[in-house]
Amino acid sequence: LTHQPLPPNPEVWQVILSDHRLDSGDPWLRVKTSHRPVYERARVALPAGVDEAILLNEGGEVCEGTITSLFLRRGGRLLTPPLSCGLLPGVLRRSLLEAGRAEEARLMPDDLRDGEILMGNALRGLIPARLL
């Protein structure tokens, strides 16, 4: 077991759409586990200068990042994909939904160009992101 300080977040994360797909029917996607082969493959494939990859499911719907939940601020609303798309019910995601600060909505890749992308987790909070 090792530890080290968490480096500060870049002001804006650079993100890409991953070629790796999630299976929305996979029950393991909804459990925090160290068995994360799809996420690990997508993370290893990140080009230099890219902070995160956005994963889609088999239907092309937006799901989440490799280590983050995804949010889209559009029209005064903070949207996040529903669990039925195949994603982890993260702590930050759940707290924003329960507080009424976010709502679930099915998102497609084209939707990401019509709002402000935010990636986040309980450790780092919400981080503005730019889709490359």
Where are each of the predicted segments found?
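Helix-start/capping segments and mature chain N-termini
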Residues: 1-132
